[in-house]
């Protein structure tokens, strides 16, 4: 819907996930799987100015209209890599998992930029921590042998309200 009223969008990469009919616009929309066939393992570095825009992320608008916050390349990347290494004490071989929403600055910083700049193994999760039951986070920790787990206190409190029986079946010994 949004792209119908935004003619400035030149390309849209579409990933098929649900097997539902997808309305594609010729010349603009391309399939992810087709584009991936064109990719090589060689990815030359693009030299950027330190103050070049890296991305714009919009605020929630909780105090009014959402505002686009532009983050610069060097400052943001240096900060997220440094804070990731020092706050989470990541070591090579660790499996790190931040449960934040990737559309928020915490998700951007500690799912994508910080871990990848540090060469870390980072996990992404799509869904809610209570589906199919309140043991979902702990199931993922066990299955993937997560060492470092970062989530919000509100998430833990909401799961805690469901009781500790959802935690007990899982082996959490991989956590530091």
Where on the chain are the PLM-derived regions?
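Residue(s) in the substrate-gating loop at a strand-loop-helix junction
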Residues: 101
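Conserved AMP-binding/adenylation subdomain of ANL enzymes
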Residues: 77-95, 105-148, 161-164
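Adenylate-forming
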Residues: 1, 19, 126-130, 146-176
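A structural motif corresponding to the C-terminal end of an alpha-helix
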Residues: 2-9
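Conserved pre-ATP/AMP-binding loop-to-beta segment of ANL
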Residues: 9-15, 19-20, 24-58, 65, ...
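Short functional hotspots where side chains directly engage DNA or cofactors
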Residues: 59, 70
